[in-house]
Amino acid sequence: MQIFPAIDLRGGQVVRLYQGDYDKMTVYGQDPCAVARDFIAAGAKYLHIVDLDGAKDGTLANFETIAAIAKQGGLYIEVGGGIRTEDRIRQYLDLGVSRCILGTIAVKDFAFTARMAQEYGDRIAVGVDARDGYVAINGWKELSSERGVDFCRRLLDAGVGTVIYTDISRDGAEKGTNLDLYRELAEIGGLHVTASGGVSSLEELKELRAIGTHAAILGKALYTGRLDLKTVIEAVQD
């Protein structure tokens, strides 16, 4: 199992939002590069970065920060937030980012997403955010009519091999993981699923690994000290 500690960026700072609400933001650090180095020191091989400014308004406000983190080396980095064009994908891949995550655009322009998956292969992933089982879009403000699990099946059929699946109701709440959901997702043969949202105990991570979840993203639980990254990596990372 791959463990992705998360760095969410807003205005160059390391922050966490509560359930995607920009008005419920906590700042955890002023130096994202130092946070990334701390993760490496704890044994991290992977890093999940979200550009919250990009997600909100499509800007590249955190581009230089992400470039600096990538330049340090030592990590497989995936980036999401505001990636809606092939030009943006290329910009990130040219920086040394390993994988780009498509979000709302994957729902709104499925043909584009399929084309990018064909063009860039495993360097493209899709972030599927769901509430009450249905796909949410536009910063989690709207629910679509499609079940998240069904959308994941469509993505796999279109050539997308990796999905980062976030249960919004659990995100930033440290309420624990919706294990039944990830059991259902694990039954989609050939799809690599990354669990995201509310992961807050080592027991959950062991359970996720046991049911075949490919990776997990750790956010708030790391920053509050509820989970120790070194301990987690030693226990569950392949």
Model regions: which residues?
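Glycine-rich, proline-tolerant flexible connector loops at the mouths of alpha/beta enzymes
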Residues: 46-64, 104, 109, 165-175
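Charged helix-capping and loop-helix junction motifs
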Residues: 60-67, 141-150, 175-183
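Short, acidic/polar
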Residues: 28-40, 84-90, 144-154, 205
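Catalytic cores of alpha/beta
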Residues: 73, 77-99, 180-215
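Conserved, mostly hydrophobic/aromatic
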Residues: 8, 39, 47, 92, ...
